[in-house]
Amino acid sequence: MSSRSDLKIKRVSLIIFLLSVLVEFCYGGFTSEYVRGSDLPDDMPLDSDVFEVPPGPNSPQQVHVTQGNHEGNGVIISWVTPVKPGSKTVQYWCENEKSRKQAEATVNTYRFFNYTSGYIHHCLIDDLEFDTKYYYEIGSGKWSRRFWFFIPPKSGPDVPYTFGLIGDLGQTYDSNSTLSHYEMNPGKGQAVLFVGDLSYADRYPNHDNNRWDTWGRFVERSVAYQPWIWTAGNHEIDFVPDIGEIEPFKPFMNRYHTPHKASGSISPLWYSIKRASAYIIVMSCYSSYGIYTPQYKWLEKELQGVNRTETPWLIVLVHSPFYSSYVHHYMEGETLRVMYEQWFVKYKVDVVFAGHVHAYERSERVSNIAYNIVNGLCEPISDESAPIYITIGDGGNSEGLLTDMMQPQPKYSAFREASFGHGLLEIKNRTHAYFSWNRNQDGNAVAADSVWLLNRFWRAQKKTWLDAF
């Protein structure tokens, strides 16, 4: 009887082990049968209520916050005043305190062709208390405006934290649906990882920068209250020599600051931050990244210095995906992949998020680092040290969805669907995180795709049969 019980236990254990292996390493790629209408999304009109200018002759608008330092206890608060600079002061205070502190913003404007921006304010507030809610007030008199944000807990290996994932948003009716869907999600993130392509102002004649203003007012309802971590996409380049605009990224870099100097970067377009139990590296696909370039040297040093015992979850944000099975934009990220995939495997990056492709896709854990020009080893293979690659360029922009997919579905593709939506990454502890993707047409609590992630660093530290999944 005892031997039978032992045999039964062994069989059950073996089944669990095999199923666990299949969860992460099977090549049963799935293409969703859900079909969304193929009509191109329409941009919302200028008189849409989501673009409404706040009352008052010079009220702050387009308010947004992002992380302000490397450690996580700083913020950059930004806003625009349309007529004159107005007050540069930010008043801020903890939730349970009456006394207020204040900080001063810098102010700048820029010109783009025949457009002149409003007065753009950026205020860095540093050395705030971890795990604390802060209120802040900008403007003056009866036209001042009040918002709040949360400083995350201090970094540690088992600090739970939830990130929202949005990319290629634009300002269409579908964009509004994506943002509303994210806001109403019961598990809404505490910060958003934004993987590039913000306003799509470059789709208008002469890159009409008024559409940067409408976009800033549109997303204010979220980004004024929780930090969005910015990645620059191709629609932020705004390089138009024909009309005399030869400074790449001019509107983006004037409007959206990043804490790049805190991580030793020389450019706002690539940088890193720590937030709770995550270490996030933002890369620029549209800046030089070849060997010996500043971005290359910075990333090489950056990956070597990540302390995975403090921040075990290593996340990379890029705009152009390394792996995609959609026909449009196919292999546009190939040179970046060839350059850096071996590093991502070596340093056990957990997940790479990208946009650019206007659809959703999740990869298996694969790598293609054995290839050279003569050996012919050009197929991606299963690799337990490799990250999962998730493309989430499905925010709703006016270019529409990409529905033409490679057939048959490549083995590296685990799930794909041409729909608009958003993602959530829920970090549970040092070993486990849960990713889910919600299409706009689902109920708020319904995930169209989901996967448990086992941390690559801790998996390597504890190689037992149970760790196989």
UniProtKB/Swiss-Prot annotation:
**Sugar-bearing residues?**
N114, N176, N307, N429
The main enzyme category here is hydrolase
Q: What is the lineage of its organism?
A: Eukaryota, Viridiplantae, Streptophyta, Embryophyta, Tracheophyta
Q: Does the keyword Metal-binding apply?
A: yes
**Protein name, as recorded:** Fe(3+)-Zn(2+) purple acid phosphatase 12
Q: What protein family is recorded?
A: Belongs to the metallophosphoesterase superfamily. Purple acid phosphatase family.
Question: Which cofactors does it use?
Answer: Fe cation; Zn(2+)
Swiss-Prot/TrEMBL keywords: Disulfide bond, Glycoprotein, Hydrolase, Iron, Metal-binding, Secreted, Signal, Zinc
Q: How is the cofactor bound?
A: Binds 1 Fe cation per subunit.
Q: Pfam families annotated for this entry?
A: Metallophos, Metallophos_C, Pur_ac_phosph_N
